[in-house]
Amino acid sequence: MQWEVVIGLEIHTQLTTRSKIFSGSSTQFGSEPNTQASLIDLGMPGVLPVLNQEAVRMAVMFGLAIDAEIGQHNVFARKNYFYPDLPKGYQISQMELPIVGKGHLDIALEDGTVKRVGITRAHLEEDAGKSLHEEFSGATGIDLNRAGTPLLEIVSEPDMRSAKEAVAYVKAIHALVRYLGICDGNMAEGSLRCDCNVSIRPKGQAEFGTRCEIKNVNSFRFIEKAINSEIQRQIDLIEDGGKVIQQTRLYDPNKDETRPMRSKEEANDYRYFPDPDLLPVVIEDSFLNDVRATLPELPPQKRERFQSAFGLSAYDANVLATSREQADYFEKVASIGGDAKLAANWVMVELGSLLNKQNLDIEDSPVSAEQLGGMLQRIKDNTISGKIAKVVFEAMANGEGSADEIIEKCGLKQVTDTGAISAVLDEMLAANAEQVEQYRAADEAKRGKMFGFFVGQAMKASKGKANPQQVNELLKSKLEG
C-alpha cells in the first residue's frame, strides 16, 4: 500500500525581550540557577502579572509578516496541568482568542519550487522552568530562571507531506523571526523548539490518520530524522496489523527512534479558562500602523530583488537571503566590489568555507565586507588574478591588513605588460620544445588538452602573476604562428 504523510508543526520561539512576559525579571540566558525568578514567576500568593508590551509588539510584527489576521481583541487563558517546573500549577497562554490568527508562509523547496504552508495561529504564552536531571544523583533539580520567558507559539496547518518539507518550513520560520529581530533562533539554547505532529494515511484518503506528537526537537537535522523515524514506525505498526495510538513521544537521537512519553492530551484536559488576573488585550489601529512601519524587507522580497536587481540565480538568491546578516554582508560587498555575481560567489564559497572551518557566524567573520569588497575591486581592475585573490583572502583572514596593503607588501600585482608576458612565454616554450612540436602536429581535440599544459607552465613561470586572459591570447598566437 502507498502511504501519504501528513505533518503539522508547533514552533515555540523565545522572544528577545529584556524582561519576562508578566514580570520585570531578566531573560538573559546562562545565569546561575534560580537567580532570575521573581515572586510573580514563582507564583507566590498576592502577586499580579503585568503584560510586557514589547512581547505584544513582537507578536503583532510576526503576524503582519505572515499576512495574518491580527486579533485586536485577544485574551489570556490559564492552561492547567501539574509539572515540577511549573510553579503556579498552570501556564498563562492563549486559547480561543489568540493574538495572531490565520496566515501563511511561502517556503522554498530543494527542487526550486515554492510551497505555501498555512499557519493556523500564533499565540503568546509564558515558558516553564527547566528540570535538571544530570546534575543530581537520585533527584531532579528545578531551575526557574526560564519560567515566565515570553514565547510565541506558531501553529501550522497540516500542510507538509515529507520530513524535508517540514525542515524547509522550520528554516523559513527561523529565518523570518531572525529577520524581524524577535528571536535569536539559537536552537542549542532552546530559543526555538519544535513539536512535530505526524500521521499517515492511505494515498488518496481524505480522512487524517491518528497523529503522534514528537516533543521539543531542537535542531534541523533531528527534526528530519525524528519525523522519518516516526513515519517508518507508524507504517510498520499498521502493516503488521497494529493500530497507532494518539500519544506524545520523544526522539532519541542515539537510537534514532521515537519513544512514548505520555498519552496525547486534548484541549479539554487542560481546563482552559480566561485568566482573571489579566484584562483582555485591545490593540488599536494606530499601534498596528506603528508596527507595520517598522517591518524590514522580508526574505521572499529580498530573494526576488536579488534576482531582479543583481541577476542572481534563484539558488544563489535563496542562499544569500537565508539570514539578514548574510544578506546585508553580501549587499555591502557587491556595492563596494562592483560585481554582484562575483560577490555572491566569494561570499557563498570562499567566505562560507572559512566560516564553516572556524565555526563562526557571518557577523563574526575575520574578513569584513569592506575588506572583501576592496579585494574584488582589485580583481575587477586586473590588479590581481582570481588565483592570487585566494592568497590575498587568506592573508586578510589572518589579520594581515587590507587587500591593497597585502598586494603591495607581498608584491602580488598582476603582470599586464604584453612585452613582459611575451618574454616569459618565449622562455617557457623554448624549455618545452618537444611538447610544442607535439601540439602543432596534433588534431584539434588533442590540442585543447595540451593547451592547458602550456597555460599551467606559463602561470608557474610567472609565479601566478601574469594576466590569464593575456596569457591565453599570446600563447595561442605563438603556438599557432
Swiss-Prot record:
Question: Does Nucleotide-binding show up as a keyword for this record?
Answer: yes
Pfam families named among the record's database cross-references: GatB_N, GatB_Yqey
* GO term, biological process aspect, one: translation
What InterPro entries does the record tag this protein with?
Asn/Gln-tRNA_amidoTrfase_suB/E, Asn/Gln-tRNA_Trfase_suB/E_cat, Asn/Gln_amidotransferase, Asn/Gln_tRNA_amidoTrase-B-like, GatB, GatB_C_1, GatB_Yqey_C_2, Gln-tRNA_amidoTrfase_suB_CS
Q: What is its EC number?
A: 6.3.5.-
Per the record, what are the reactions this protein catalyses? L-glutamyl-tRNA(Gln) + L-glutamine + ATP + H2O = L-glutaminyl-tRNA(Gln) + L-glutamate + ADP + phosphate + H(+); L-aspartyl-tRNA(Asn) + L-glutamine + ATP + H2O = L-asparaginyl-tRNA(Asn) + L-glutamate + ADP + phosphate + 2 H(+)
Could you give a GO molecular-function term held by this entry? ATP binding
Q: Which UniProt keywords apply?
A: ATP-binding, Ligase, Nucleotide-binding, Protein biosynthesis
Subunit structure comment from the entry = Heterotrimer of A, B and C subunits.
- Summary of the function given for this chain in its UniProt record: Allows the formation of correctly charged Asn-tRNA(Asn) or Gln-tRNA(Gln) through the transamidation of misacylated Asp-tRNA(Asn) or Glu-tRNA(Gln) in organisms which lack either or both of asparaginyl-tRNA or glutaminyl-tRNA synthetases. The reaction takes place in the presence of glutamine and ATP through an activated phospho-Asp-tRNA(Asn) or phospho-Glu-tRNA(Gln).
Family membership noted in the UniProt record: Belongs to the GatB/GatE family. GatB subfamily.
User: How is this protein named in the record?
Assistant: Aspartyl/glutamyl-tRNA(Asn/Gln) amidotransferase subunit B
Give the organism, scientific name. Answer: Pseudomonas fluorescens (strain Pf0-1)
